[in-house]
Amino acid sequence: MAGRWFTFGFFLGLAVVFFSWPGAQLAQASCGAVSCFVTIGSQQQVAMEGLLTVNGIYNYTPMRLLPGTNGVIPGLDTNQRQMILDHHQETRTITQTATLDLNYGLTERLGLEITIPYMVRTHHHIDGLGEDGPNGEGQSTTFSSDGIGDMRVGVKYNVLPTLRSLVVFGFGVYLPTGVTGANDSTGALMEPTTQLGRGQVGLNPTIYQTYELIPHRLNEFAFGGYRHTFRNNVGYQFGDQWDLNGGLNLVTVPWLVLSAQLNYRYIVHDNFSSSLSRSATPADAPDFPGEPVVIDPTIKNRQVPTTGSTFLGFTPGFSVNLGQMIESSWTRMTSLYFYSSIPMVRDSNNSLAQGTSFIF
């Protein structure tokens, strides 16, 4: 465990060093297992030709049950290609991500972006409802994993560069570099939704826009993104994801910018190629607790009923321009920022929902 946190701390420290490197810059700020999604302008803009901008980002995203939900969801056995209804009861997930984001200007309008996330994820649920325990109450199971997540490589093109506005189209590809074979505390393979990687390539077109309402004082920004992940080798396909963000930045003094944004995310249901069973219930006595009851042995594409979610959050924050406060080669064009994403509306289909998240 000590080695795991040393590795995470080393990566986070490395990210902070890069974030402070001359040339790192901020213009605005978007936020698994989901991860917080906040819009950071220096990620979305195209760097000047020949210039490398570097962002070091840490985000903390807790997920817990919403009031009025019980967290009972299907169990997914990828080895046997089996979906078992009402087999798990979710408790919590915490995801911490340290991201190194690199942007390089190929031309005045065309840029290259590489995003490298390092993740630490912990998860707890009750496994084997109707199957384990003297009364079918299941078994407490924990999961912890750390490592590189799915990297993203993309290009961006600035189609409308003016003194007061920007419109940037982007297209990225998520590479299956994240861990997909981690086990839980019982030694069983953990389900795809909790692994650090998705195990398959994903496509991610984006659009980013900003306009100075009051030059050098107040600007608005908007971001839209879509992510499609192809079915992986264990028959699992994550649902398509839509992100929409919009907000304002106010320059109070040259070194302090206040920001506020709304963040909306919609994720459709996941799909799993599997047979279908259900957990045993007291009505199945004397075979209770007992093995899951088969409903349909045919392996075919099935919607995972408790996946998919809707999230609307409000994210206040601020950024500090170190170059305006301290004149040195290490602080020139360098900014620090902090954001807190506060949930306003959430629907997670009886599963875990994103809580208040922090990004800096």
Kindly label every feature range from the protein language model.
Residues P67-T69, I73-N79, V234-F360:
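Outer membrane beta-barrel transmembrane domains
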Residues Y58-R64, I116-T122, V159, V173-V179, ...:
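Transmembrane beta-strands of outer-membrane beta-barrel pores
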Residues G50, I94-A98, E137, T141, ...:
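Residues that define the transmembrane beta-barrel architecture of outer-membrane proteins
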Residues G41, I84-H88, G136-F143, M190-Q195, ...:
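Extracellular loop and loop/strand-boundary signature of outer-membrane beta-barrel proteins
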Residues L110-I114, V153, L163-V167, P215-E220, ...:
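Repeated loop/turn-to-beta-strand initiation elements of outer-membrane beta-barrel proteins
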Residues Q82-G154, N158:
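Long, hydrophobic/aromatic-enriched structural stretches that serve as scaffold segments
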Residues S42, G56, L100-Y104, I114, ...:
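Residues on the lipid-exposed face of transmembrane beta-strands in outer-membrane beta-barrel proteins
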Residues W21-N79, V179, G323-W330:
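Outer-membrane beta-barrel biogenesis signature
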